[in-house]
Regions:
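Conserved hydrophobic/aromatic beta-strand scaffold that supports enzyme active sites
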Residues: 55-57, 68-72, 89, 115-117
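Active-site region of the double-stranded beta-helix
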Residues: 61, 80-83, 87
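Glycine- and acidic-residue-biased ligand/ion/polar-headgroup-sensing regions
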Residues: 75, 84-103
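A short, N-terminal "cap"/entry segment at the start of jelly-roll beta-barrel domains
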Residues: 22, 26-65, 109, 151-178
Length: 178
C-alpha cells in the first residue's frame, strides 16, 4: 500500500462520495475510503496488561466530561474483558469492530463507517478487530468518574480508567507528527 498525499486522499473521498450518490454500494465505498486512512500522524500507545489494543487520546474536556480517544484493535484478537460506565459514541474508521460476550461468543460486528451511540452500564464484553486491525473513535461522555472497568476472568475488577486517568495518559503521550 502506498501513502497518499492529503490532496490524493481528499480526491479519493470525493470520488467515493460521488460514486455513492450515483448508486454505488455505500459499504464498498466506505471500505475504499477507510483503506486510505493514513495513520502516520498518530502516535499509538499501549497499556500494560491490556494486550491487542493501542490508543491515542485525542482530547479530555473536564467541563463537558468528555474523553475522545482513538483505539486500534489488533486483527483477529480480543482485548481483555471490560465494562463501559460512561455513555459513548463509536465511529469505525478502518476495518470492523467485533464484539463478544463474556463467554467469548460473537454478538455484533460493526463495519467500517458505522456509528453507534450506547448508554453506559452494559454487560461485560470483549472486543477485537476483524481480518484487519480496527481503528475506532470512541467519545465517552457524561462522567468524571469511572469510564472503563477492566475485569478478570471471573468478573472481578482488576482496574478502572476514568477521566483523570485519560487526562494523565494524554499528557504523557507523544505529540502528533504534524
Amino acid at each position: 500500500m502506498h501513502k497518499l498525499t492529503r490532496r490524493q486522499g481528499l480526491v479519493q473521498i470525493g470520488t467515493t462520495v460521488a460514486a455513492v450518490a450515483l448508486g454505488a454500494s455505500a459499504s464498498k465505498a466506505a471500505t475504499q475510503v477507510a483503506a486510505a486512512f493514513d495513520q502516520s500522524n498518530v502516535k499509538w500507545n499501549t497499556l500494560d496488561g491490556i494486550e491487542h489494543l493501542s490508543y491515542h487520546v485525542l482530547d479530555v474536556d473536564r467541563d463537558l466530561k468528555v474523553v475522545d480517544v482513538l483505539l486500534k484493535f489488533a486483527a483477529n484478537e480480543k482485548i481483555i474483558l471490560h465494562k463501559h460506565h460512561a455513555d459513548y459514541s463509536t465511529f469505525i474508521i478502518q476495518g470492523e469492530l467485533r464484539l463478544y460476550d463474556a463467554k467469548g461468543d460473537l454478538t455484533e460486528i460493526r463495519p467500517t463507517a458505522s456509528f453507534v451511540q450506547k448508554p453506559g452500564g452494559g454487560a461485560p464484553h470483549t472486543e477485537g478487530g476483524g481480518d484487519e486491525d480496527c481503528i475506532a473513535w470512541f467519545s465517552n461522555k457524561g462522567t468524571d468518574g469511572v469510564i472503563y472497568e477492566i475485569l478478570g476472568p471471573d468478573g472481578e475488577t482488576l482496574a478502572t480508567l476514568g477521566l483523570q486517568d485519560f487526562e494523565a495518559l494524554m499528557q504523557a503521550q507523544d505529540e502528533p507528527v504534524q
